Regions:
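Gram-negative/organellar outer-membrane beta-barrel architecture
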Residues: 421-434, 439-626, 631, 701-707, ...
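C-terminal segment of classical bacterial N-terminal signal peptides
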Residues: 17-23
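Sec-dependent N-terminal signal peptides
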Residues: 8-17
Length: 809
C-alpha cells in the first residue's frame, strides 16, 4: 500500500471515530473540499480528476482554486461537470481568446489596415508613451466568463453557489493574498488568472488583483477554512525546474512564480488528504495549442486513474453510495429527509414561483423517482429547456437537494448604465451597442456588439454586470476603460535588399473635432519615407464618403540591371507628394478613393560619371489623378489562411493639368488563399499592369517583394507592362512552422523607351521556403531558382531571400 493511500485511510478513520462520538441524529458528515492549483495550460489536467469525481459520484462540498484551477473550479461549482468542461476547453480557440482585438474580418477597415504592421503599440498620455500594464487586457476572456456564468451573476456570495467556492488572487497594492468569496464570479475568475506582465491587473475596489499563484498556488488552507474535513488536491504547478530546463521565457516566468510561493505550497501539500500530481513532463504553462491541450488532458486522466483506488476508499469509508443525479440511494435504509433545497440556473422566473411549481419542501422524504417525475412535469410546462437534480448526502439521515433548471425564456433589459466613459459620450456608446431597455438579453449578441465597439480602438476593456430585478427583468451595467486619444506604434523589418527598416507611427483620434483623425508614419534606415494623412472617417470609422488630405516624402534605393541581369547602378528614388480627395467605404472589406495629387520627382544615380547620358537625372513636377480600389477579406495579414485581397489602381498625368510628363498606367491584382484540412493552404496570385508607351522610367514596374515574384532578384524586372501568375502551396508542420512550395511565371512583358520594343522572353521562377511565426513577426527563408533577365532566355540564377518582422511598406 503506497504512502498517500495510507495517509488517506488514516485521515478517514480519524474522522469516522470523531463522527461516531456525535449523536445518532447528527446532521453532519465529513465535508469534502476540492483544491485545484494554478499552472496556465497545465491546469487542463484538472479535468481528469473532475471526471473521476463525477464517475465515482463523490460529492464536493467546497472548492478553492488558483488561476486556471480557480476558473475550472468556479465553473464546476455552478454545475459544469467534467465532461462539459472537457468539451469547453477543446472547443475554445485559446490563442484567439488571448488576443484582445476582434478577428481581422470584424475590424473596422482603418483598424484592419493598421493591424499586424507593428510589433509594439503604446498609448500616449500627452506625448509620453504609456506601456500597458500587461500584454493582454483580457477583453475576450472577460466576455467569455460573463457568458458562462451569466445565470449566477445575481448571486453575490459565493457561499450561495451550488458548491461554495473561492478564487485566490494577490493584491499588488498591499502585497497580500486575497480570497475572493463574493461579488462578480466572472470577475473573480478573471482576477485569479491575471499573470503579472502577461495579463493586466483587475481593479477590485481599491485593490489591483493578479494571479494568486504568486503566493498560494495550492490553497488547501483556504478550503480548510471553509470547513472541509477531507481535502482532495490536484497540483499541476510549483515544481522548481532544474537549471538545464530553464531554457525559455515561459520557463523563467514559471520558475519565478513558483519560487515566490514555494514555502506555502510545501505546507499546503502536506495538509491534503488526497494529493494528485499529474506527470506533465515536457509540457509548459503556455501550451494552449490543440495537440498540447489534448496531451495535458490525457495526462490528467492518467493521474486520476492512478488515484482512483484512494478515491474509492474515501467514497465507501464515508458510505456515500450513488449520489450524483441518482434514481436510487443505496446507502440509506429508508428515504432520507431533505435538509436543504436549492434551485439554480433561473434568470426570469422568481425562486418563490419555482418553489411553488416544484412542490417539494425541506423535511420531505427524498425519493429520487418522485423528484424526477416533478421535473418532467416542470419541463412539460414549456418554460424550460432542461432540468436536473443532484442529491448530496449531509448525514446518514439527511440530504441536500440541488435543482438545476435552464429556462426557455430570456430576461428583458430593464435599464442600462454606462460608466468609465470620460471622453466618449453616453449617446455614442449607447448607439454603437445597439441595445435598448425592453430588449431580450442575449449575452452572445451582446458580446458580439461589445467586440464590435472594442474594435474601434478607443477602449482598454469593456465589460458588464447583470443585476436581477425580479419578474424576468435585469439591469445591465456596462463598464468601460478608455484608452488615450494618442497611439504610438513601433515596427522593425529586415530583408536582404533593404536590410533593416524601422518604423515609428503616430495616431491622434478626435483631433479638434470628434471623428477627425491624423496618422503619421516615419520609416528609416534601409529607406526613408514619411507619410501624413488627415481624414474624417467619423468616430464610428464607417462614414461611407469621407474627405482626406495627405502628404508623403520618399527616398528609397532602386537597383538598375543590364540585359545580362547584372547590377550596374543604383538610383535614389526621391519624391515629395501632396494630395487631397474623397474616400468611399463599404462595410469593412471594400474601400476606394479618388485624389488629385501634385508630385515632385528628383531621381539621381548613386554614382558620378562624366557621361551624364548613361545614367541621367530626372527632375519633374507631376500633377496626377489617382483612383484606387481594394477588396480585403483575408483572415490574417501575416499568414493568411482564407480570403481574397484584390487591388486596383489607376494613375493619369495629363497636359490639361499642366504636368511636365503626361502618362497613364493601370494595374490590378488578386491574391486568393484557401485552406483545407486545417494544414494545407493553396495561394493563387494574378498580377496585371499596362501603361502608355511614354511612361517615365521612375514609374515603371519594379519587382520589390518576393511574396509576389521569385526567381529574379529585387528590381531585376523593370517593365512598362507586366503580367504574371503565382501558385503557392503551404503546409503547416507545427503550430508556428510552415513549409512552402512556390512557382511563378510572367505571361506578358512590355518595355518601351526611345527604342522599338525589345524581344523579351518570359520570366519564371520556383522555390522552396520555410516560414516561422515568432514574437517579432514572421521569419521567411526562400531558396529560389529562376530567370536572371528577360533579355537572355538562357540565363538563370539561384537566389536566397530572407526576411523577418512586419512588412509595413
Amino acid at each position: 500500500m503506497d504512502a498517500p493511500l495510507k495517509k488517506l485511510i488514516f485521515a478517514v478513520l480519524l474522522l469516522l471515530i470523531s463522527c461516531s462520538a456525535l449523536s445518532a441524529n447528527s446532521m453532519e458528515r465529513p465535508k469534502i473540499g476540492l483544491v485545484l492549483s494554478g499552472g496556465g495550460a497545465l491546469g487542463f489536467a484538472h479535468i481528469g480528476t473532475l471526471k473521476m469525481l463525477d464517475s465515482l459520484q463523490i460529492p464536493i462540498d467546497y472548492i478553492a482554486g488558483t488561476s486556471m484551477g480557480g476558473i475550472l473550479g468556479a465553473l464546476y461549482a455552478i454545475g459544469y461537470d467534467g465532461l462539459e468542461l472537457e468539451k469547453l476547453v477543446q472547443q475554445t480557440d485559446w490563442i484567439d481568446l488571448f488576443t484582445d482585438h476582434p478577428s481581422r474580418g470584424k475590424l473596422p477597415y482603418f483598424e484592419k489596415k493598421m493591424a499586424d504592421r507593428f510589433q509594439l503599440v503604446f498609448s500616449m498620455e500627452g506625448f509620453h508613451p504609456s506601456p500597458p500594464s500587461g500584454l493582454i487586457f483580457g477583453q475576450k476572456v472577460t466576455l467569455l466568463f460573463s457568458s458562462l456564468t451569466f445565470p449566477y451573476e445575481h448571486i453575490h456570495s459565493f457561499d450561495r453557489l451550488p458548491i461554495p467556492c473561492r478564487c485566490v488572487a494577490v493584491d499588488l497594492v498591499t502585497g497580500n493574498e486575497v480570497v475572493l468569496d463574493r461579488g462578480s464570479l466572472a470577475r473573480a475568475m478573471r482576477s485569479t488568472m491575471a499573470i503579472p506582465t502577461i495579463f493586466s491587473p483587475v481593479e477590485w475596489g481599491d485593490s489591483l488583483l493578479v494571479d494568486g499563484g504568486i503566493m498560494n498556488n495550492l490553497p488547501v488552507d483556504v478550503v480548510r477554512a471553509m470547513g472541509a474535513d477531507i481535502v482532495i488536491a490536484v497540483d499541476v504547478g510549483n515544481r522548481l525546474h532544474p537549471k538545464e530546463q530553464i531554457n525559455s521565457a515561459l520557463k523563467v516566468l514559471d520558475q519565478s512564480i513558483n519560487m515566490l510561493g514555494i514555502q506555502k505550497w510545501r505546507e499546503n501539500s502536506k495538509q491534503a488528504d488526497v494529493l494528485i500530481r499529474p506527470d506533465l513532463e515536457g509540457l509548459t504553462m503556455g501550451d494552449f495549442v490543440e495537440d498540447k491541450i489534448a496531451q495535458i488532458i490525457h495526462d490528467g486522466k492518467t493521474a486520476a486513474r492512478q488515484a482512483q483506488t484512494g478515491l474509492v476508499v474515501l467514497k465507501y469509508a464515508l458510505n456515500l453510495g450513488d449520489i450524483r443525479n441518482p434514481l436510487k440511494l443505496t446507502q440509506y435504509k429508508k428515504p432520507p429527509k431533505i435538509f436543504g433545497l436549492q434551485i439554480t440556473g433561473h434568470t426570469t422566473i422568481p425562486f418563490s414561483e419555482l418553489y411553488e411549481m416544484l412542490g417539494i419542501r425541506p423535511g420531505d422524504p427524498c425519493r429520487p423517482h418522485k423528484i424526477h417525475e416533478r421535473l418532467v412535469e416542470l419541463k412539460a410546462t414549456g418554460e424550460f429547456v432542461s432540468t436536473g437534480f443532484d442529491v448530496i448526502p449531509v448525514s446518514h439521515e439527511h440530504v441536500r437537494l440541488l435543482i438545476r433548471v435552464r429556462e426557455q425564456k430570456r430576461p428583458r433589459i430593464h435599464g442600462i448604465t454606462i460608466d468609465g466613459n470620460e471622453r466618449m459620450g453616453f449617446q455614442f456608446l449607447y448607439q454603437c451597442l445597439g441595445i435598448r431597455p425592453g430588449d431580450v438579453l442575449d449575452t452572445e449578441a451582446l458580446n458580439r456588439q461589445i467586440m464590435k465597439v472594442y474594435g474601434l480602438g478607443y477602449f482598454e476593456t469593456i465589460r458588464y454586470d447583470i443585476e436581477s430585478m425580479g419578474e424576468d427583468r435585469v439591469f445591465l451595467r456596462i463598464h468601460v476603460k478608455e484608452l488615450p486619444y494618442r497611439k504610438l506604434r513601433l515596427g522593425l523589418w529586415f530583408d536582404t535588399f533593404h536590410k533593416m527598416v524601422a518604423s515609428v507611427a503616430f495616431q491622434r483620434n478626435d483631433l479638434l473635432i470628434n471623428g477627425l483623425r491624423f496618422d503619421a508614419e516615419l520609416q528609416m534606415a534601409g529607406l526613408l519615407q514619411f507619410t501624413g494623412k488627415l481624414f474624417y472617417p467619423s468616430q464610428t470609422l464607417n462614414l461611407p464618403v469621407y474627405p482626406f488630405a495627405y502628404t508623403r516624402y520618399r527616398n528609397a534605393p532602386v537597383a538598375i540591371y543590364d540585359g545580362y541581369g547584372h547590377q550596374i547602378a543604383s538610383y535614389k528614388d526621391k519624391s515629395a507628394t501632396i494630395g487631397a480627395g474623397l474616400g468611399l467605404l463599404l462595410r469593412n472589406a471594400f474601400h476606394a478613393d479618388v485624389a488629385l495629387i501634385q508630385e515632385h520627382m528628383f531621381i539621381e544615380p548613386d554614382i558620378a560619371l562624366s557621361d551624364q547620358t548613361l545614367f541621367p537625372t530626372w527632375e519633374d513636377r507631376l500633377r496626377e489623378v489617382r483612383l484606387t480600389a481594394e477588396f480585403d477579406n483575408l483572415d490574417s495579414r501575416l499568414i493568411p489562411s482564407n480570403g481574397l485581397y484584390a487591388h486596383f489602381q489607376y494613375e493619369g498625368s495629363f497636359d490639361e493639368l499642366n504636368t511636365d510628363v503626361p502618362y497613364q498606367w493601370i494595374h490590378f491584382y488578386a491574391d486568393l488563399f484557401h485552406t483545407f484540412q486545417s494544414k494545407h493552404t493553396v495561394r493563387l496570385l494574378n498580377y496585371w499592369r499596362e501603361s502608355t508607351s511614354r511612361l517615365p522610367v521612375y514609374k515603371h514596374y519594379y519587382n520589390d517583394d518576393p511574396e509576389h515574384l521569385i526567381g529574379p532578384d529585387y528590381h531585376q524586372v523593370a517593365m512598362n507592362d507586366v503580367s504574371f501568375v503565382r501558385l503557392e502551396y503551404r503546409y503547416r508542420l507545427a503550430q508556428s512552422l510552415y513549409m512552402r512550395l512556390i512557382a511563378n511565371t510572367t505571361y506578358r512583358l512590355g518595355f518601351q523607351l526611345d527604342d522599338p520594343s525589345y524581344d523579351l522572353s518570359q520570366i519564371w521562377g520556383f522555390g522552396i521556403g520555410i516560414k516561422v511565426m515568432s514574437l517579432l513577426g514572421p521569419i521567411d527563408i526562400v531558396l529560389s531558382r529562376g530567370s536572371k533577365s528577360a533579355y537572355r532566355e538562357d540565363q538563370a540564377q539561384t537566389n536566397l531571400f530572407f526576411s523577418f518582422g512586419y512588412r509595413f511598406f
